[in-house]
Amino acid sequence: MTAPADTVHPAGQPDYVAQVATVPFRLGRPEELPGTLDELRAAVSARAGEAVRGLNRPGARTDLAALLAATERTRAALAPVGAGPVGDDPSESEANRDNDLAFGIVRTRGPVAELLVDAALAALAGILEVAVDRGSDLEDAAWQRFIGGFDALLGWLADPHSAPRPATVPGAGPAGPPVHQDALRRWVRGHHVFMVLAQGCALATACLRDSAARGDLPGAEASAAAAEALMRGCQGALLYAGDANREQYNEQIRPTLMPPVAPPKMSGLHWRDHEVLIKELAGSRDAWEWLSAQGSERPATFRAALAETYDSHIGVCGHFVGDQSPSLLAAQGSTRSAVGVIGQFRKIRLSALPEQPATQQGEPS
């Protein structure tokens, strides 16, 4: 499904976006997300609960077509939220704005957590539309994590004090022969999913930090479990967005990342939602160490999820451009490879997490 002909898009949005996705794709300002489990429950649990019930009504999980129909019915049943575009926003950098325009994302005024529920349903519908029509070449485990990320997000938002419970994910059939803009369609829609799950993971990490600071072990465990499932979903989103061969990448995707289509140096590093997630991760070490000291395995399993997400990103990048090609972000004349840049970020991000449970490092159990 693409945008209706009468839809008004922001000035500067590239023409290709509306050809491959339903836009505008509305998201709130991630800086306004709640920071505690109690705030989260008050802000969004009722709406998220409606979404969970809608996606799990009898028969909704029999196959992807049934899940798509349930998703669309659920979206239609929810009362509208949001009060139009944010407009001028002092918290938005020029690079943030460039990235939003490139993917048809419109920052919307209104209750940010409820907007996240709606964005999750919109992103899920976008993926299911393609899968019902075209199938998917994602391996089954990646597909389960990818779609399972939506269930984890909505389930946790509905009951923030409990770890999200997995739901049945119908499998996707193998992808059919390529059609026009197939790769670009997955690229744009996969990025919509990534931004939704990145907001969710940032939110879960913030709630983990607050719970740990208050000594709330059940709350910290629930938040950590949500963060792990959402990071696994982010991994699936990266693999889905990068499901293209090198020819498709060079012909359909790379031109959208470079002038004249894109501003110079546009990069996913400047996604507003990614920036907020990275900020939360950078400040989370004490919380993960506290949780580890309580004997929890969540810090180790989240660390593994984060590492594997970066490994998948490295794999996608290497598949597209090889392990020696310079990054689009590289300074003029630099020979630093794109794969090397991602690997360095992997090292930095993992340094925010304890390497193993504290009780295994000689601390009292």
Curated annotation (Swiss-Prot):
Effect of residue 191 to A: Does not affect heme-binding
Disulfide bonds: none
Keyword list, A-Z: Antibiotic biosynthesis, Heme, Iron, Metal-binding, Oxidoreductase
Outcome (variant: residue 313 to A): Almost abolishes heme-binding
MF term (GO), any: oxidoreductase activity
pH dependence: Optimum pH is 9.0.
Domain of life: Bacteria
Regions that span the bilayer: none
Residues that bind heme: 313-317
E.C. number(s) listed in UniProt: 1.11.2.5
Catalytic activity from the UniProt record: 3-methyl-L-tyrosine + H2O2 = 5-hydroxy-3-methyl-L-tyrosine + H2O
Cofactor binding comment, as recorded: Binds 1 heme group per subunit.
Cofactor(s) it depends on: heme
UniProt pathway annotation: Antibiotic biosynthesis
EC supergroup of this enzyme: oxidoreductase
An annotated GO BP: antibiotic biosynthetic process
Function summary: Heme-containing peroxygenase that mediates the hydroxylation of 3-methyl-L-tyrosine (3-Me-Tyr) into 3-hydroxy-5-methyl-L-tyrosine (3-OH-5-Me-Tyr) in biosynthesis of saframycin A, a potent antitumor antibiotic that belongs to the tetrahydroisoquinoline family. Involved in biosynthesis of 3-hydroxy-5-methyl-O-methyltyrosine (3-OH-5-Me-OMe-Tyr), a core structure of saframycin A.
Name assigned to this protein: 3-methyl-L-tyrosine peroxygenase
Gene giving rise to this polypeptide: sfmD
